Amino acid sequence: MSAEEAIRGAMAEVPKAVAAGLVDMGSGMMLSIKTVDSHPQAVLDILAPATKEMFEGEMVTTIENLFKKARGVESAEHYFREILVASTNLWHYFGRLKSNEEIVLVVVCRADVNLGMLVMKARQVAHNATV
C-alpha cells in the first residue's frame, strides 16, 4: 500500500475527516498529505517536525527511558503509540503504523466527530497500512 493509498483510505474511512497525512519520524518529513481545506503552507511545513517532537522530543524520550529503567526493560521500542489532541474546532489523531512505528498517521476531524469512531477507524488504517 502506498502512502497515497493509506491517506485516501483514512479520508474515506475516518468519519468527518478533513485532513490526513503520513509523517516519517526518521527523516522528519511528510510522506503524503491530503486536505479538504486550504491551509497556510507554513502550517503544513511544520506539521512533520511538530509530530516528531510530540512523539520523540527530548522530554518524551526521557519519560520513556525512565519507565523502561523502572521496569527493568532494555528496548528501543517507543511506549507512546497514539496521541489525541483537541483544538477549538478539530480533533487531531496521531498514531504509529503497526507495520513501521517510524511512520505516524495523522488524521484531523471536525470537533463534532464521534471520538470512538475516530479512534477505531484511524486505528484500522494505521493497522492495515504498509508504507
Residue ranges of model-derived segments:
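Non-catalytic interaction/Regulatory regions outside core domains
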Residues: 1-131
